[in-house]
UniProtKB/Swiss-Prot annotation:
It is found in: Cell membrane. Belongs to the 4-toluene sulfonate uptake permease (TSUP) (TC 2.A.102) family. GO terms for cellular component: plasma membrane. Keywords: Cell membrane, Membrane, Transmembrane, Transmembrane helix, Transport. It comes from Haemophilus influenzae (strain ATCC 51907 / DSM 11121 / KW20 / Rd). The chain crosses the membrane at residues 4-24, 28-48, 49-69, 81-101, 107-127, 147-167, 183-203, 210-230, 243-263. This is Probable membrane transporter protein HI_0902. InterPro entries: TM_pro_TauE-like. It is a multi-pass membrane protein. Pfam families: TauE.
Amino acid sequence: MFTFILLCLLVGALAGFLAGLFGIGGGLVIVPTLVYLLPIVDVPESLLMSTALGTSFATIVITGIGSAQRHHKLGNIVWQAVRILAPVIMLSVFICGLFIGRLDREISAKIFACLVVYLATKMVLSIKKDQVTTKSLTPLSSVIGGILIGMASSAAGIGGGGFIVPFLTARGINIKQAIGSSAFCGMLLGISGMFSFIVSGWGNPLMPEYSLGYIYLPAVLGITATSFFTSKLGASATAKLPVSTLKKGFALFLIVVAINMFLK
């Protein structure tokens, strides 16, 4: 258990910084890492993805608080953009989480990997060619976008930054404000996803001690003990890095995760 907690502390430090920097909630680091670590504490193979996803959402809540708080101070949250998008995403994540929690591990793992590949490709293409804004952010687009973002985020156990950021930038919001708005949405998304996986895994006799549904509490504590603080460092870094560096860093990060998932 000591080794497990120590590893979770290290994962949390990295995930928190990336969450603040990219507005991703850290899930793209946390989920694949937990798939490797959870067998140490006797989580059965059939429940690895469900537990990794549920635990990731729980950590997103804590990490997202620190990240969103810092972005708010920097003035990076566009409240007009998130007032419809955030609640729609929350509802979508909760409903889809109930379904995802019951999927076979191999299926959910493949869905996760495919989503990561999509995100990586999306960011690489946006670097090669600047996107021309031809769409506006309307209530209808916010509802449709929120539903789709919630579905994808639920399957990937992420704060939705990889979907929210390009969605907002395509509608005229600059990338720093899109990242800040994504961090705020990610915090609320995490709350919804967390409760969804608690409900879907409630009373499962195969889960180890100190579990709450499909959430393994020691992992949550270990990861958030460091991620809460490093997320603020990552959020501060967005004010110092140029836009092109942010895009390249985001794309490179997603590509590395995608390769890792396919080699697993």
